[in-house]
Amino acid sequence: MDIPIFGVNVPAPPIRIKKELLEEYARLYKGIRNREDTVSWRTLIITCRKILGVADPDYKPVRKSKLTQSKKLVTFLIKKTYLEPLFFEIMYALGFRGIKTKKKADLDYLLFSGKHHPEPLLWNLADYLKEKSKSVAVINPIGHYNDGQTRVVGPSVVFMKINKVVILTSTQSKFGGSVSVLSNVIRLLRNPKFAQKVKEVDIVIPMFGGSRGHRLGQSEDVGFEVMEAAFNAKLISLPAEDLQKKLSKEINNLPKFRFFSLDIHNSLYPNKIFKDEGFDFISVDPTGEIVKDIIKYLHRCRVQSVPVKVVACDTGAVPRTENFAKNLLGLLGSKNKELQVICIEKKRPQAGIVSSVKISKIEEWKREGGKIVKSRMRIPKKSSLKESILIYSDDMIDTGGTAEKDLNYLSGVYPNCIMKIFVATHPVLSRGLSAFKRIGADVYFVGNSLSIEGLSEQANVQLVDLAPSICDAIEK
């Protein structure tokens, strides 16, 4: 076994450790700080017990005589991390009781990873909350048994009141998510010693898997399709409902459960299912953060005074596009007090197939005395030679086929467009990063709701951090 070189990536331990355990100490120190593969709660406790001389750490606590060494080790390991607020919970898990302390301050947020390998968005949310002077702790409760089965372990007790527990998760196996894993993480609240300290539980699923996959009009002869957006909502609701029933017999103040997702414009699923089960479901609007980043980009490129045209890709996209335009117009500045909203109409002989594209409506929006004045514009019969910036907004970017047709058509109508911007909340990209080349926009503003390998390295892609939007929704 190699002995780590301390001082390079890992500082020397604060206590004397057996030579054969030095590598485990080094792995633990780095694992606590590794945001891509964060050490689980159970691994943290078991490894600390081993380092502190426990031969059988699954069954035996640390000896009382090791209290001083334990304090030094734990304090050193979790210093300047999101485990620091959980010092006494960690000491309790090591086996120590009755450690003298002042009354612990309430914790604003306890964040749980609800999927294999914590999402970058989890850490962005923690960092953003910390910047807002909130007290924040983060736990990865997900590990594995020897046979690979998921093992979910959280603190057995907490010593402070917790305003909000936030579980950031995914329902998609491709991204390390699972309805089953999420259900088990929710069941950590089955522990009454934990649940009685929690005021609210917010379960955040940035992109609700299956909510955009089924297309109306598909051939029913292919087979009976389970509607995952509806069924998954029911599956996720059940453990929360079951917890509340059982906890109601054990504790007085039950935590409130709420569910969140980003940019859901389907009013039926999964919203109706959650509400039928008695839970609030909130679709988080990410427009504010996306618009802020676009405005910064336009200023960097010194084109903030060029007329802007915002495009609704189809009839169903009109409400979200108008919301986008309203936010954008409010931030464009004094040199650009107006923009145009263009509505596209498509003919679809069948789901996923577009036979024709045309402009159905154009409105000019002006800011006048704090109000937006809208006026109908003529649809150009000839190509417009005026300079403009086109912003094409959609809820997601996948293969890029439809957007390619739309932008080709719009480029013909507005040949002097100096910049084409594509905006999407969710980077699905089921056929890879080639979608960007296919669409042909100059720059893409894409939300970080899904972790796509290589996305952040794309030169013409601006990743928009959606953590502030999530935080604002949770805070309301």
Where are these regions (language model features)?
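PRPP-associated nucleotide enzymes
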Residues: 1-476
